[in-house]
UniProtKB/Swiss-Prot annotation:
<dbReference type="GO" id="GO:0009231">
    <property type="term" value="P:riboflavin biosynthetic process"/>
</dbReference>
<comment type="similarity">
    <text>In the N-terminal section; belongs to the DHBP synthase family.</text>
</comment>
<dbReference type="InterPro" id="IPR000422">
    <property type="entry name" value="DHBP_synthase_RibB"/>
</dbReference>
<feature type="region of interest" description="DHBP synthase">
    <location>
        <begin position="1"/>
        <end position="200"/>
    </location>
</feature>
<feature type="binding site">
    <location>
        <begin position="139"/>
        <end position="143"/>
    </location>
    <ligand>
        <name>D-ribulose 5-phosphate</name>
    </ligand>
</feature>
<dbReference type="InterPro" id="IPR036144">
    <property type="entry name" value="RibA-like_sf"/>
</dbReference>
<feature type="binding site">
    <location>
        <position position="28"/>
    </location>
    <ligand>
        <name>Mg(2+) 1</name>
    </ligand>
</feature>
<feature type="site" description="Essential for catalytic activity">
    <location>
        <position position="125"/>
    </location>
</feature>
<feature type="binding site">
    <location>
        <position position="28"/>
    </location>
    <ligand>
        <name>Mg(2+) 2</name>
    </ligand>
</feature>
<keyword id="KW-0686">Riboflavin biosynthesis</keyword>
<dbReference type="GO" id="GO:0000287">
    <property type="term" value="F:magnesium ion binding"/>
</dbReference>
<dbReference type="GO" id="GO:0003935">
    <property type="term" value="F:GTP cyclohydrolase II activity"/>
</dbReference>
<dbReference type="Pfam" id="PF00925">
    <property type="entry name" value="GTP_cyclohydro2"/>
</dbReference>
<comment type="similarity">
    <text>In the C-terminal section; belongs to the GTP cyclohydrolase II family.</text>
</comment>
<dbReference type="Pfam" id="PF00926">
    <property type="entry name" value="DHBP_synthase"/>
</dbReference>
<feature type="binding site">
    <location>
        <position position="32"/>
    </location>
    <ligand>
        <name>D-ribulose 5-phosphate</name>
    </ligand>
</feature>
<feature type="site" description="Essential for catalytic activity">
    <location>
        <position position="163"/>
    </location>
</feature>
Length: 347
């Protein structure tokens, strides 16, 4: 069923049709209208504005963003999902830029491979979003999902998306979206579907090293993985790896923030002690300096667990309300969340 949904969505995108994209089939989530920018028309833009009512955005690759000179909207992105907005733009030929016709003009110029930065003015009425390299296998967002579906359809990887809002002004949820799809004859695809579809043939990690080591006084199996950016991530497994193991992810920066914060240090030490006691796994994820961990940016760590044959796991976390979208697409399931409270600890 998930793979059939992806195939149907791909065919719809190829034909220039709109689809609805949601996170997971079994979650109460929001949805976006999506279509390939290569097939943009004023009528499609007007449908988004009048029927979906959300913000019309255009999702692009980093290559396209660089070519068009799209600078980040803010220097420090502290939004909940760290959505990669750039400065808004209009095509230079636009007057106000807000009509469906002029927004369509801007969209079509964005997908035109000959367009240059000077062909646009800033700010404007189209909001570009930059998809992460690696797509939904790295970040499970609608930005990445919409670009991925365009790539899978064999069209230019530029997608137009818009959140769907109900007539009463609230966000449309699963049942509302199902009704919307039925009313307008639209296909539905989930981020988790795309992950599962791509995982049939793709893997963004490789294992570089496996060895027996001593980790803070206890024997462990160490696995070193390399991702598509050539960053290395290290996993320590204490005892035999079994299904429903206790797992902790820890983001490793290149600075000394861990030593500068007693709370961060204590929380990590508490996590290590609990993982060792329960023969679990701790994964140290390498990230660029000063890059904050993103809520949806966990695909590489998910692939590491899948590589080791884990399907179900208990998650040790310091963020009780953090959501992990699309896990089912990786063949993973969090059976329990155990929340850490940082504080003094004796090892």
């Amino acid at each position: 069923m998930p793979l059939n949904r992806v195939r149907e969505a791909i065919e719809a995108i190829k034909k220039g049709e709109m689809i609805i994209m949601m996170d997971d089939e079994d979650r109460e989530n929001e949805g976006d209208l999506v279509y390939a920018a290569a097939f943009s028309t004023p009528e499609k833009v007007n449908f988004m504005v009048s029927e979906a009512k959300g913000l019309v955005c255009v999702c692009v690759t980093s290559t396209c963003s660089d070519r068009l000179g799209l600078a980040p909207m803010v220097r420090e992105n502290n939004s909940q999902h760290e959505t990669a907005f750039t400065v808004s733009i209009d095509a230079r030929e636009c007057s106000t830029g807000i009509s469906a016709f002029e927004r369509d003009l801007t969209i079509r110029k964005m997908v035109d491979g000959t367009s240059k930065p000077e062909d646009f003015v800033r700010p404007g009425h189209i909001f570009p979003l930059i998809a992460k390299e690696g797509g939904v296998l790295v970040r499970t967002g609608h930005t990445e999902g919409s670009v991925d579906i365009c790539k899978l359809a064999g069209v230019a990887p530029v997608a137009v998306i818009c959140e769907i809002i109900k007539k009463d002004g609230h966000m449309a949820r699963r049942d509302d979206l199902m009704e919307f799809a039925k009313e307008h004859h639209l296909k539905i695809v989930y981020i988790s579907d795309l992950i599962e579809y791509r995982m049939q043939n793709e893997m963004l990690i490789l294992i570089k090293e496996r060895s027996e080591v001593e980790f803070l006084g206890k024997r462990a199996e160490r696995y070193v993985f390399q991702d598509h950016h050539r960053r290395e991530h290290t996993l320590y497994a204490f005892g035999k790896i079994i299904d429903n193991s206790l797992v902790k992810y820890h983001t490793v920066g290149k600075d000394l923030s861990l030593l500068e914060s007693e709370k961060k240090y204590s929380t990590l030490m508490q996590a290590i002690k609990k993982i060792q006691e329960e023969n679990g796994l701790i994964i140290f994820m390498d990230t660029p300096q000063n890059a904050a961990p993103q809520i949806k940016d966990f695909g590489i760590g998910a692939q590491m667990l899948r590589f080791l044959g884990i399907k179900n796991f208990r998650l040790l976390t310091s963020e009780e309300n953090r959501e992990y979208v699309g896990l089912s697409g990786f063949g993973l399931n969090v059976t329990e969340k155990i929340v850490l409270q940082g504080g003094p600890i004796q090892l």
